[in-house]
UniProtKB/Swiss-Prot annotation:
Record GO biological process: carbohydrate metabolic process; fucosylation; lipid metabolic process; olfactory bulb development; positive regulation of cell-matrix adhesion; positive regulation of endothelial cell migration; positive regulation of endothelial cell-matrix adhesion via fibronectin; positive regulation of sprouting angiogenesis
Record's bilayer topology term: Single-pass type II membrane protein
A cellular component term, taken from the record's GO annotations: Golgi cisterna membrane
Keywords: Glycoprotein, Glycosyltransferase, Golgi apparatus, Lipid metabolism, Membrane, Signal-anchor, Transferase, Transmembrane, Transmembrane helix
Name of protein: Galactoside alpha-(1,2)-fucosyltransferase 1
Cytoplasmic side: 1-8
């Protein structure tokens, strides 16, 4: 028997390595398809992207309850790539997210959000829409469509496979038929929900009698709206008279309610909201840079009083129960009414209380 040379030993070793690698690849390949490995390519056209981006979803793999899913829910039944430009503050981006989800489903398209929207919403909610990589966004042949703030027939028949929406949609007419899905998307992470409920428990224990409480979340929008509404839109924000009437509405219908006040103007609230009945609690921190604590608190209440703005809308929409809102808060000739339809903004069952427009008449006097 001839002794093996050093060269023969090297060749034999390489052959064993190659065969082992092939065997391993075949094993993984078979196992992956046996368990239904899903592949969703985010690239609309491989020729447009140097490095294709892919998301791998293992069906049945449990997700952490406090993280957002990176995978589409039904990638096989949807096509195309739709997204929306994230613009505005917290409530604006919630409206954009919900509208994108609803319109994409209506048109059988796959929805993706951009990283900025994910950064704004994912720390607060268990959102599930996948994130579109920046390099894919920059190479996609988008058609752009600016939405107005109510559902229109043409939005139900959009044939564009690659569509980037924009605007400030926040109307129930887009997504109310998916209310339970929207509520699921905007489920708070556990630590935020538990913190909010802890605040409400302390309010309950602070009462001199031991019985279940009815909590009414109150959101008072102030801040930049104090200038924007009268100067640009010929409108007003909610005043103390409105808040008193709204609270009396709940006092007449619910036994001993507790009003949980949040605002980006807490100092004004403490100075102007009547607390003589002992049922008003100033619980908000008013931090506009981190609004999720106030938002979580409002959603854990039973009912809502809102003034104006998308933040209050979403708090009321997610809380459920009764909602009282500020109605007719602009003059009839306001330009705001060209971009805002009250009947599309407020649910039909919500209760509107007319705003006091007398400060605007004073401003209009020569």
């Amino acid at each position: 028997m001839w002794p093996l040379s050093h060269r023969h030993l090297c060749l034999a070793f390489l052959l064993v390595c190659v065969l082992s690698a092939i065997s391993f690849f075949l094993h993984v390949h078979q196992d992956s398809f046996r368990h239904g490995l899903g592949l969703s390519l985010l690239c609309p056209d491989r020729r447009l992207v140097t490095h294709p981006v892919a998301i791998f979803c293992l069906p049945g793999t449990p997700m952490s309850p406090n993280t957002s899913s990176p995978c589409p829910q039904h990638p096989a039944s949807l096509s195309g790539t739709w997204t929306i430009y994230p613009d505005g503050r917290f409530g604006n981006q919630m409206g954009q997210y919900a509208t994108l989800l609803a319109l994409a489903q209506l048109n059988a398209r796959q929805a993706f959000i951009l990283p900025a929207m994910h950064a704004a919403l994912a720390p607060v909610f268990r959102i599930t829409l996948p994130v579109l990589a920046p390099e894919v966004d920059s190479h996609t042949p988008w058609r752009e469509l600016r939405l107005h703030d109510w559902m229109s027939e043409e939005y139900a028949d959009l044939e564009d496979p690659f569509l980037k929406l924009s605007g400030f949609p926040c109307s129930w007419t887009f997504f109310h038929h998916l209310r339970e899905q929207i509520r699921s998307e905007f489920t708070l992470h556990d630590h935020l929900r538990e913190e909010a409920q802890s605040v409400l428990r302390r309010l309950r224990l602070g009462r001199p009698w031991d019985r279940p409480r009815t909590f009414v979340g109150v959101h008072v929008r102030r801040g930049d709206y104090l200038q924007v509404m009268p100067q640009r839109w010929k409108g007003v924000v909610g005043n103390s008279a409105y808040l008193r009437e709204a609270m009396d509405w709940f006092r007449a219908r619910h036994e001993a309610p507790v009003f949980v006040v949040t605002s980006n103007g807490m100092e004004w609230c403490r100075e102007n909201i009547d607390t003589s009945k002992g049922d008003v609690m100033f619980a908000g921190d008013g931090q506009e840079a981190s609004p999720w604590k106030d938002f979580a608190l409002l959603t854990q209440c039973n009912h809502t009083i809102m003034t104006i703005g998308t933040f209050g809308f979403w708090a009321a929409y997610l809380a459920g129960g009764d909602t009282v809102y500020l109605a007719n808060f602009t003059l009839p000739d306001s330009e705001f009414l060209k971009i805002f339809k009250p009947e599309a903004a407020f649910l039909p069952e919500w209760v509107g209380i007319n705003a006091d427009l007398s400060p605007l008449w004073t401003l209009a006097e020569p």
